[in-house]
């Protein structure tokens, strides 16, 4: 299975931590260079070309813009290289040692029957209907709410459709509720949260600080 890990090229320490933690899975992976949104947004003329509306009106933070561009680039890589499906993670995510065997078995089952046109969220704090069972054991449809792009499975068809709506950037990369309708893809949820957030307090997050400042502004809009 192809595994992409989104990470800023300059963030050597986070890459080293991820590599150390992920080694327990014995899976090969590739770091995928992310986009530094802070650097990009220092030149509004450059960032505005990528946005649905000017930066100051968009209610998006520079970090969110960089994150969206990074995930878009991964979708493009999947499509351009005709990769049938992939696991996408971010560099602050990890798989707990106690979950490794179950996680690998789950990936094998997924590979044997990849749901078409789908994104499967492997993260926590996601709401879904337990009645909406799928053919893949432990995976449910009827996604309701929840964010996070630090761990998910995606097939080629879903990546292709997401590419058509991500640019110009209007939403955060993890606005799954909006993306599932605008792109016409299926958002599914794994009951067991195999991919964990290694920075729950967001002490090392480039996005969280500015994102919290935006919450009140977004609620007004």
Predicted regions and their residues:
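An acidic/histidine-cluster motif and surrounding catalytic segment
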Residues: 1-89, 93-221
């Amino acid at each position: 299975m192809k595994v992409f890990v989104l990470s800023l090229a300059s963030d050597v320490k986070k890459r080293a931590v991820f590599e150390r933690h992920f080694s327990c899975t014995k899976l090969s992976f590739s770091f995928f260079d992310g986009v530094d949104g802070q650097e990009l947004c220092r030149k509004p003329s450059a960032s505005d070309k990528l946005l649905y509306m000017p930066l100051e009106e968009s209610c998006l933070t520079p970090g969110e813009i960089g994150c969206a561009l990074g995930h878009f680039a991964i979708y493009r890589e999947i499509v351009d290289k005709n990769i049938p499906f992939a696991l996408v993670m971010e560099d602050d995510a990890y798989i707990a040692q106690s979950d490794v065997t179950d996680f690998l078995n789950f990936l094998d089952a997924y590979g044997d029957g990849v749901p078409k046109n789908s994104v499967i969220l492997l993260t926590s704090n996601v709401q879904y209907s337990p009645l909406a069972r799928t053919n893949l054991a432990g995976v449910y449809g009827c996604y309701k709410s929840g964010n996070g792009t630090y761990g998910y499975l995606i097939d080629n068809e879903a990546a292709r459709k997401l590419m058509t709506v991500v640019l110009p950037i209007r939403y955060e990369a993890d606005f799954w509720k909006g993306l599932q309708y605008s792109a016409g893809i299926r958002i599914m949820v794994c009951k067991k949260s195999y991919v964990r957030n290694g920075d729950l307090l967001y002490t090392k997050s480039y996005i969280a600080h500015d994102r919290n400042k935006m919450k009140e502004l977004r609620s007004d809009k």
